[in-house]
Structure formats: structure tokens, C-alpha cells
Amino acid sequence: LAWVPELDTGIDEIDRQHRRIVDYINKLYELRESPDREALGDVIGEMVDYTLSHFVFEETLIENAGYMFAGPHKKVHELFTRRVSEMQSRFDGGEDVAAELHGMLSRWLFNHIRNEDHGYVDAAKTYLRMARGNEQAERERLKAELLQELEQRQQKKGWLARLLSR
């Protein structure tokens, strides 16, 4: 699979995670006919674990952003997770599912990004901008507090210390 710019959401961390999932799908493709089932199993396991952590990150982001379809989006993730878990169980049972899994993942990921993930982008970007603004405001507040504290300490010094600090 090759990443295409139209899949970019414009949210750096999400795009980085999506690209990493594509890397896992490509590793799966490379190993699909390998006699090394252990290596194939490792890639499948790592890909599933990473994808689940991505889902948690993404779901938390869109819930915090107040995205109105966060619930249905999470359901789509749950259905996908169930399908992949079933395939992983079949693999663990000795069945050769690499080509089937690769095909399903390839189709699902790109369709999901285009049709589902792009829906939350505006809400998530607005939320992230506000969060960054709040962080900046908090830094400014803390800075002002610190300066005020330093001023108060300076005023509390005795007349001799104030005289010598001039």
C-alpha cells in the first residue's frame, strides 16, 4: 500500500499513526507467503495492538472534541476489532489468513479514513486549537503569578536588602 496525500487529516499525530498502520499492513503483505509463521504472527499481533492503541487515542480525541458522531465512530472501531480478532484466532488455530487479512485491512483502512475519519477533522482541529490556546493562557497566568510572587518577596525584604539590591 502506498500512502496518498488525500488520506492526510491534517492532524499530525493521527496521520503519523495511520501511516504506521499502513507500514504494518505492508509488512503483513511481505510475509503473507512466508513459511515463518512466528514472524507473521508477531506482525499480526503488533499490528492489532498498535491499531487498538490508535483507536483509543482517536476515540479520546473525538470525544474530548465533542464530535457528535463519536459514539457511532467507536462502534465502527469495535466491529472492525471483532473481525480482526476473529482472523487472529483463526491464524492462531493454524489457518492461513494472511492474504485475506491483508485484503480486508487494505480496503477497510483507506475507506475508513476517507469516509469516517475525515468527518471528525474539523471538530478535532478546533478542539486542539482551543487546547493549545488554553495551554498558552495557562503559561501566561503562571508567569504572571511567578512575577507577582517575586515582587512580593522583593517588597518583604528589609530596607537594607532593598537598598543593596538597587
Predicted regions and their residues:
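Small-residue-biased structural context
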Residues: 1-166
